[in-house]
Design a protein with these regions (language model features):
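The alpha-helix within a helix-turn-helix
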Residues: 11, 22, 52
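Short alpha-helical DNA-recognition segment
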Residues: 16-34
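Short C-terminal boundary/hinge segments that cap the last helix of small helical domains
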Residues: 56-67
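Residues within the helices of the helix-turn-helix
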Residues: 8, 19, 49
Length: 67
């Protein structure tokens, strides 16, 4: 079981680069890259909220549960 963060998919849909998202959200490119590559073990709700606002999406569009 795993929760996948589909950040790369949503960024591609919005035609947004990592550095642009980093500036909008206020998170380092390194930390966003960890989320994007699936290496993150956790994400704060405040971070998730900021990413969703910047990408104009819902949390369910970013997160996917795989059994």
């Amino acid at each position: 079981m795993a929760i996948i963060v589909n950040l790369d998919v949503m960024m591609a849909k919005r035609k947004m680069r990592l550095n642009e998202l980093s500036q909008k959200v206020g998170i380092t490119i390194a930390n966003l890259s960890i989320l994007k590559t699936g290496k993150a073990k956790a994400i704060r709700f405040s971070t998730l909220e900021s990413i969703c606002k910047a990408l104009d999406c819902q949390p369910g569009e970013l997160l996917e549960f795989i059994d």
